[in-house]
């Protein structure tokens, strides 16, 4: 466990992760029942989704109404949080981006009472809460990427982390630009024209991701890697993800 993850775990004890209402009735047996003896207690019904255990299908309801529903047990009510961390090389430039990603994982893990937080490379659990943490420095189509993540999800949160120099580069000087993913090098003058063109491209790129997020009812949160921890928690609270413990 990294130092940033440990700090996130510590800070998460003072806040609570807010579970979206639409995620409260679609868990998949990921957490233990709140008290002994409740593990098989019936709680509610929900619509069948591909991947559900057919043994939980209520055949009586199907016969009466032609509706496919599954029985939800008491221990299945709390949702799974699937956490997706960008592992690409660009997240290490600067290291603060990776550290913020690690901090968020620890923070959510600690703050999400009654949930099981699991790190994934691909979505697996139907009706899970899915959190994507990335700098989004990719040419991939945002709608295609979010369609894959949002499929059968209860809700999706996209958290973009940029360094201060990526979000607002300073003009002046020149240097060698190195692509952290490919190793490609290019001499670049950071004059007003170049920086203006970069900011225009970044704005358009951001708009594409925000529009895709709206289409799939996903939340989009922007963070600066160098921000103090208090500011990070404040941004997540403003996005409806966290609240202080009472």
Kindly give the residue locations of the regions a language model identified.
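Von Willebrand factor type A / integrin I
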Residues: 1-34, 126, 146-246
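An amphipathic, basic-hydrophobic helix/alpha-beta surface used to engage anionic
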Residues: 1-121, 129-134, 139-140, 164-167
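A short acidic (Asp/Glu
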Residues: 142-144
């Amino acid at each position: 466990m990294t130092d940033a993850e440990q700090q996130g775990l510590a800070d998460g004890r003072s806040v609570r992760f807010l579970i979206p209402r639409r995620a409260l009735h679609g868990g998949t047996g990921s957490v233990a029942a709140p008290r002994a003896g409740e593990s098989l207690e019936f709680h509610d019904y929900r619509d069948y989704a591909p991947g559900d255990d057919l043994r939980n299908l209520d055949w009586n309801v199907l016969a009466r109404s032609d509706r496919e529903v599954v029985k939800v047990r008491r221990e299945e009510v709390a949702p799974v949080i699937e956490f997706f961390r960008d592992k690409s090389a660009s997240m290490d430039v600067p290291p603060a981006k990776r550290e913020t990603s690690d901090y968020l994982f620890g923070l959510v893990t600690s703050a999400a009472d009654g949930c099981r937080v699991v790190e994934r490379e691909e979505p697996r659990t139907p009706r899970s809460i899915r959190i994507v943490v990335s700098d989004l420095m990719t040419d991939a189509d945002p709608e295609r990427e979010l369609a894959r993540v949002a499929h059968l999800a209860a809700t999706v949160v996209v958290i973009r982390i940029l360094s201060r120099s990526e979000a607002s580069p300073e003009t002046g000087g020149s240097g060698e630009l190195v692509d952290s993913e490919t190793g490609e090098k290019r001499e670049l003058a950071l004059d007003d024209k170049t920086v203006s063109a970069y900011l225009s491209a970044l704005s358009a790129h951001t708009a594409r991701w925000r529009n895709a997020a709206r289409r799939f009812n996903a939340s989009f949160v922007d963070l600066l890697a160098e921000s103090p921890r208090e500011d990070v928690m404040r941004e997540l609270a403003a996005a409806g993800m966290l609240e202080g413990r009472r």
